[in-house]
């Protein structure tokens, strides 16, 4: 019975504490990481799809197709480089907890891997004639 009373008192104290104004910042961080992760997943699917198109391009050598592929790769590359800059700046913040820091580092590492694959594919497209 004493345990239940102590637990109820603890819950009442926790509910009475003022809400931190930082919650918005942490929710925004969570939303940004989720959005970037979803976009990285879309870019990964795009890379898989476009790899087949690059194989066809190497066989045909169509210049219009080459220009289109380069434009699409450039847009994805710009998104990843922009997100890398954002995540690097956010990692310098001192108010990050362990989970947020891990999420930012994971998103940064995922972006780096995708950027490496994008650049390799871009080089393949540029070298095809």
From Swiss-Prot:
Effect of residue 77 to A: Over 20% reduction in IgE-binding
Expression across tissues: Midgut and hindgut contents as well as fecal pellets (at protein level).
Alphabetized Pfam families for the sequence: Blo-t-5
Phenotype when changing residue 105 to A: Over 20% reduction in IgE-binding. Further reduction in IgE-binding. Most significant reduction in IgE-binding
InterPro entries membership: Mite_allergen_group-5/21, Mite_allergen_group-5/21_sf
GO molecular function: IgE binding; protein homodimerization activity
Family the UniProt entry places it in: Belongs to the mite group 5 allergen family.
Name recorded for this polypeptide: Mite allergen Blo t 21
Species per Swiss-Prot/TrEMBL record: Blomia tropicalis
Lineage, opening ranks: Eukaryota, Metazoa, Ecdysozoa, Arthropoda, Chelicerata
């Amino acid at each position: 019975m004493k345990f239940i009373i102590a637990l109820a008192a603890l819950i009442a104290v926790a509910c009475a504490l003022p809400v931190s104004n930082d919650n918005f910042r942490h929710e925004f961080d969570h939303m940004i990481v989720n959005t970037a992760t979803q976009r990285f997943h879309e870019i990964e699917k795009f890379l898989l799809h476009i790899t087949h198109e690059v194989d066809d391009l190497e066989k045909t050598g169509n210049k219009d197709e080459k220009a289109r592929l380069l434009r699409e790769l450039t847009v994805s590359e710009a998104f990843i480089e922009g997100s890398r800059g954002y995540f690097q700046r956010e990692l310098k913040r001192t108010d990050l907890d362990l989970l947020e820091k891990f999420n930012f580092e994971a998103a940064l590492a995922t972006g780096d891997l995708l950027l490496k694959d994008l650049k390799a594919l871009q080089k393949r497209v540029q070298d095809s004639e």
